A protein has these predicted regions:
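Bacterial Sec-dependent N-terminal signal peptides
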Residues: 1-24
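Residues that flank catalytic or metal-binding motifs in active/ligand-binding sites
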Residues: 45, 149, 153, 208, ...
Length: 524
């Protein structure tokens, strides 16, 4: 009897061990059907967030690179808490205050990175306890875009959780997960996240495509729900419409919001590729930022598009998306755009260490074709005479499909530049009357009248705009004689299906051409 009991006990122990080993032996991504979409499932190993074990030898070498040492020095400096005198001088504790990454958020990144690369357990322990204490005591809410501050907490916490995983106590893992869920519930998108802004809006920024995705990957083994919610949204609604838009080699949210919106498309690309899922987007994504190469004027400014604040003393910079895209696609032209003003936001500095291609050589765009056409859903063309200080630049727009949000009603418009702006997009995003949904914004700046386009004035025409969003709503906007407001009372497009519908179809480029030489055309 004792032998039987011993045999049965040994058998079950053996089965348990085999099952346990099987659960922990899936080192690579697998793909599963989840409610009608096939999605990547994180490997059951750590690290899997931003880096994998195979990346660590290269990362250790990178730590000796002068540029990486410089970034690390910056992070170490940022890791020092503000002095009481510095805190007293702070006037605004909006999300930008937290994006400065002073104190614990920079400190724990360096500590977790140190453990990841060099194995210093004391650094891991410091990062785990400091970040947990921070997570348990933050509650920013949504006022003033503070969801972005909450997102930084998810991202930093996720790094510590994943990179220091084998140094965490089970009680700490549980506490981290509880904090992630609590913080996510306070964010603008909510938790579970609402799938209502898959093309444009704040949910097409940090919250979903970087912050919640990162936390979900880190905690997947213990709590798969967060990742599952995000990945289903992405593969069902975010990816298909982006891949369609990328085929036009351009972007719809303008020359300012590309820094936050398109950057987060690139973050999700990098995050899932590093996890092991491969490149998830249409490779045409590589050429989106080429539009900004062509928009660049000899004076350093760019021809504006969409919501932007034209300030002559500040040269527009696209360093973050250019760094992410150039490094992923090994694109020397985009590396050139990055090096124009290599200034990565502080909450993204760690990715300059992890992902930037330090060997990629920049190449000026002066051997690119002088005319560039962006096909459906855009129908846009930019033509240049050269790349030097005497360049003439002309832009022509059709707008086949209209997304809205930070996009303007500027179909059929043109801009001209020669030694100065000759025909321009007028107005400013944040003027004396305010910003989004201000009288200036909805009655002039975003409207056709502020652009070089045809107006047909009908005194009886109504421009219903209640769904435009933001504060200061009104039932109607001023009649400018311009283009209709797509969607239900100017509501931002919320799905791929809507984008292709009659409501959001605003034109069609019937033909285009330039030549006879494709690189240096006589006509465009």
């Amino acid at each position: 009897m004792k032998k039987s009991i011993l045999f049965i006990t040994s058998f079950f122990l053996c089965v348990f061990c085999l099952k346990s080993n099987a659960q922990q032996s899936r080192p690579e991504v697998t793909w599963e059907n989840m409610e009608g979409v096939t999605v990547p499932i994180p490997p059951q190993v750590h690290p899997r967030l931003y880096v994998r074990s195979a990346d660590l030898p290269d990362l250790k070498k990178r730590m000796e690179h002068p540029h990486v040492k410089e970034v690390l020095a910056t992070l170490n400096k940022l890791g020092k808490d503000r002095t009481p005198e510095e805190e007293a001088k702070v006037k605004d504790r909006g999300f930008r205050y937290y994006f400065e990454m002073r104190g614990v958020t920079s400190r724990v990144q360096v500590q977790a990175l140190d453990y990841l690369v060099y194995g210093d357990k004391k650094q891991a322990r410091s990062a785990i306890t400091a970040m947990l204490d921070t997570l348990q005591n933050v509650n920013y809410g949504t006022k003033g875009d503070l969801s972005r501050a909450s997102g930084v907490m998810l991202t930093c916490g996720a790094m510590v959780y994943d990179w220091c995983y084998d140094q965490m106590k089970e009680s700490e893992k549980k506490a981290y997960i509880e904090s992630f869920i609590r913080i996510a519930k306070t964010m603008e998108c909510g938790y579970p996240p609402r799938n209502n802004e898959p093309i444009a809006g704040h949910s097409s920024e940090w919250m979903i495509l970087r912050d919640m995705l990162s936390a979900g990957i880190a905690i997947y083994d213990e709590y798969p729900d967060m990742y599952n919610h995000v990945i289903k949204m992405m593969f069902k609604d975010y990816l298909p419409v982006r891949n369609y838009i990328y085929s036009g080699h351009n972007y719809h949210q303008g020359t300012s919001y590309v820094n936050v919106r398109f950057s987060n498309d690139l973050f999700s690309l990098w995050i899932l590729q590093r996890m092991g899922a491969g490149a998830i987007y249409n490779p045409a994504q590589q050429f989106v930022l080429y539009d900004f190469l062509y928009r660049r004027r000899p004076d350093g400014q760019v021809m504006p598009a969409g919501d932007t604040n034209p300030i002559r003393k500040n040269m527009p910079s696209y360093s973050l998306p250019a760094m992410l895209a150039s490094s992923f696609y090994k694109d020397s032209y985009l590396a050139y755009e990055y090096e124009r003003k290599p200034n990565i936001e502080r909450h993204c500095l760690i990715f300059d260490i992890l992902w930037r291609d330090l060997d990629l050589k920049a190449k000026a765009p002066d051997d690119l074709p002088l005319t560039r056409y962006s096909g459906s859903p855009f129908g846009w063309m930019i033509a240049r005479t050269a790349w030097d200080e005497n360049s003439v630049i002309a832009e022509m727009k059709i707008n086949e499909q209209f997304v809205g949000n930070h996009q303007h009603l500027d179909g059929g418009s043109f801009q001209l530049y020669y030694k100065g702006p000759l025909a321009i997009d007028a107005g400013a995003y944040q003027g004396s009357s305010g910003g989004y949904n201000s009288p200036h914004n909805k009655n002039f700046f975003k409207r056709t009248i502020a652009h070089n386009s045809l107006l047909v004035y009908n005194p009886d025409e109504k421009f219903a705009c209640w769904n435009y969003g933001g504060g200061g709503k009104t039932e109607f906007a001023t009649n400018d004689g311009g283009q209709r407001m797509p969607g239900d009372r100017w509501k931002t497009c919320r799905s791929f299906e809507q984008l292709l519908s009659k409501d959001y179809t605003t034109g069609k480029a019937l033909a285009h051409g330039f030549g006879p030489d494709a690189c240096k055309p006589d006509y465009s």
